[in-house]
């Protein structure tokens, strides 16, 4: 059963790509966890040991306690206590948020 998830934000390049910004494992109910597990198994593109690369289709709203710059993370940001707030079934993947928006949160804090 997959229960730990990695989330990305879009870069602002001409050809946007996802860059990892958070890992979370809490926030979904049991039914959502089972549904997401089935989706992951059906939509795996590559396997890296226990980790998987997936089709870019799902959007989740992520909450966190704090955000700050980080030289250790590829995205350039780190979030404190990330958690899943909700599964955004109403949004296509290309409407997920951008790294630029997250950087603005750091600048405006």
What are these regions (language model features)?
Residues 1-109:
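Classical nucleotidyltransferase
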